[in-house]
């Protein structure tokens, strides 16, 4: 009985310490995020190409990609930058009802359609 009580006490202390550690500590270097501003929504994606800058002119990147480099380094990467601020809130679109399904999927399946 003594061993079981001692083991249960250890487990209880372990759970209490773990609970405290998870609820009262923060990750090192974590910063509270700013609220999302729809006017600043952007997506940056790598275009799988590298580029160089010589005499102030960059080598061509394909499509909508632009050459981005750090400081005065001549070598850079091609990225595509998409700005979502112009799209607005999709739930405020007047034609949002046209995008909704006309019939639920469960109804179609019960009728034998796929």
From Swiss-Prot:
* GO molecular function per UniProt: C-X-C chemokine binding
Per the record, which residues fall in region Disordered? 89-114
Compositional bias annotation for Basic and acidic residues? 99-114
Q: Which UniProt keywords apply?
A: Disulfide bond, Glycoprotein, Secreted, Signal
Where in or outside the cell it occurs: the entry states: Secreted
Where in the sequence does glycosylation occur per the annotation? 50
Q: Which GO terms describe its cellular component?
A: extracellular region
Disulfide bridge partners, by residue number? 47-65, 51-67, 61-78
Its main localization is secreted
Quick one: signal sequence residues?
A: 1-23
Q: Explain the purpose of this protein.
A: Salivary chemokine-binding protein which binds to host chemokine CXCL8.
* Name of the protein in question: Evasin P1096
Annotated source species = Ixodes ricinus
């Amino acid at each position: 009985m003594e061993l079981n009580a001692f083991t249960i006490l250890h487990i209880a202390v372990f759970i209490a310490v773990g609970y405290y550690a998870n609820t009262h500590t923060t990750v090192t270097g974590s910063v509270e995020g700013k609220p999302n501003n729809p006017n600043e929504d952007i997506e940056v994606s790598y275009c799988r190409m590298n580029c160089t800058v010589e005499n102030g002119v960059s080598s061509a990147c394909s499509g909508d990609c632009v050459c981005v480099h750090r400081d005065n380094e001549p070598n850079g990467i091609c990225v595509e930058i998409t700005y979502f601020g112009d799209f607005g809130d999709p739930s405020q679109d007047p034609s949002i009802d046209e995008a909704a399904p006309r019939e639920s999927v469960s109804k179609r399946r019960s009728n034998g359609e796929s």
